[in-house]
C-alpha cells in the first residue's frame, strides 16, 4: 500500500533524525523507480504496437513526440490518448546534439520535439521548425511572460515553454572530503575514477569554461582550447569514471560514483533513492535553461501536434509533471499552486530547500547564463574539440 509505505518512510526518517540529533533529507514517494521501469516498458509497447499494426496505424490520428528521458509523467500520455483518441508515439533522445543529428540525417519521424533554448535557436536559423498557430494553443496564455519572447525565439512564433531548470554538481556527501562549492571538483585528481562527466559537448565544455572564469557563450578559440585542455587532462589522468547521460541515475543512486555534473530536477529524482546526495550550483555560476515544445517543419500531423502542446501546457498537466520530473513549470498557475498540490498528493509539506532547488530564486539565476546559439565557426570548433577528446 503506497500510503502506508509513505507513512512508514516518514516514521523511519523521524527516528533517524531523532537518533542523529538533526533532520535528514526528505524523500518523496518510493515508487519513482517502478514508474521509471514502467515508462520504459510503455515506450517499448508503443513502438512495438506501431510496428505490428502497420497499415492500420496510418488511418489513426497520431502524434510523434521526442523528448528526454525521465521528462514526463507517463500517465499524461494515457490521459491524452483517452481524451482525444490521438495515439502518442513517445520517444527519447539523450542530448540536444543527438536530437539534432537524428533530425538532420532524416532518420527520425518526429512531430513535436522538446529541445533546449540554444538548440531551438539553431533549428529556427536552419529553417527546420514550423510556425505555430497559437489560436489552437489557448493554454499558451498561462505561460508566464518571463518565459516568452526569449532570445531563442524572440517573436514567439515557434515555441511553447515546457520546463526550466539549472545545471550543477551532484555529489555523494559520504564520498567527498567536504561540501563541494566549485567546478574544480569536476577536474580534481583526488576523486580519480569517481567523477561522472556529462556526455555532451556544450555542457562538458561549459564546466571547464566556468572553472576558468570564462563565459559559457564565449566564441574565443583560445578560451575554448584552454577549456578543452582542462577537460582532456582530467580525462587522460583518470579523473572520469565515465561520460554519461541517463546512466547517471543508476550510478549516483547506487553510490557507484562520488560526483556528477547534471541537472537539478534529475538530482531531486535521485535524492528519492539516495539521501546521501547533495546538489550545488557552483560559486563560478552555471547554466539555467528553458526547454520548449516545437514542431518540425515537415510534420504531417500539425493539428495533433498543436493539440498535444496545448494539453501539456495546461495547469493540471504542469502540476502532474512538476510532481513527477521535479523541474519548474513555466505555467504561472502551476508554479504558484505546486507547494499546495504537493502537500495534498504526498500528505506532507514540501521542503522549502527542495523547492528552491527546483525553482531557484532570482539571485541564484543571476549567477547563471542561458546558452546562446553559437556562430557556425564556433559550433564546428566544438565538434572538432569533442572529436579530439575521444569520448
Question: Could you describe each region identified by the protein language model?
Answer:
Residues 168-175, 209-213, 289-302, 309-312, ...:
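A bilobed periplasmic-binding-protein/Venus flytrap-type ligand-binding module shared by bacterial periplasmic
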Residues 124-131, 148, 152-157, 269-281, ...:
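Ligand-binding "clamshell"
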Residues 56-123, 250:
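Early extracytoplasmic/lumenal segment of secretory-pathway proteins
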Residues 225-234, 273-297:
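Periplasmic-binding protein-like
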